Every structure is written in C-alpha cells, then in structure tokens.
Amino acid sequence: MLILTRRIGETIHIGDDITVTVLGINGQQVKFGTSAPREVDVHRQEIYERIHPGSASHFSGKHPY
C-alpha cells in the first residue's frame, strides 16, 4: 500500500484521469473530493462491501497503526 501525506487543498493523481483532493480535516475525519470518469466507480469501503458482499478486501476498515 502506498501511503501519502497531503495537506488541505493538495491533490494526488491516479493515472491520467482520476484525482483525489483533501478538502478538509476535522479531528480524525478527513474530507476528500474525487474526480473520475463516469465509468469508474468510487465508493466508501462500507458501501463497497454492501455492493460486493463476501468479496475479499485487503482493507479491514481499521487503522493499522
């Protein structure tokens, strides 16, 4: 897993057409903005697990530190 550090307003690029921007931080919550083509699904982990029940995910949803 790639781990990145970003500040509010900073963006990361995934490939040529996906961006993730840090919009805000409030305590332990981070607000992201994403931009991706319509054919790319973007979901929070708990929503993804509902859509794909029983799928083996390498994310546990718990902080590994």
Swiss-Prot record:
InterPro entries: CsrA, CsrA_sf. Disulfide bonds: none annotated. One of its GO terms (cellular component) is cytosol. Its main location: cytoplasm. Keywords: Bacterial flagellum biogenesis, Cytoplasm, Repressor, RNA-binding, Translation regulation. Signal peptide: none annotated. GO terms for molecular function: mRNA 5'-UTR binding. GO terms for biological process: bacterial-type flagellum organization; mRNA catabolic process; negative regulation of translational initiation; regulation of bacterial-type flagellum assembly; regulation of carbohydrate metabolic process. Pfam families: CsrA. It is found in: Cytoplasm. HAMAP family: CsrA (MF_00167). A translational regulator that binds mRNA to regulate translation initiation and/or mRNA stability. Usually binds in the 5'-UTR at or near the Shine-Dalgarno sequence preventing ribosome-binding, thus repressing translation. Its main target seems to be the major flagellin gene, while its function is anatagonized by FliW. Belongs to the CsrA/RsmA family. This is Translational regulator CsrA. It comes from Bordetella petrii (strain ATCC BAA-461 / DSM 12804 / CCUG 43448). The gene is csrA.
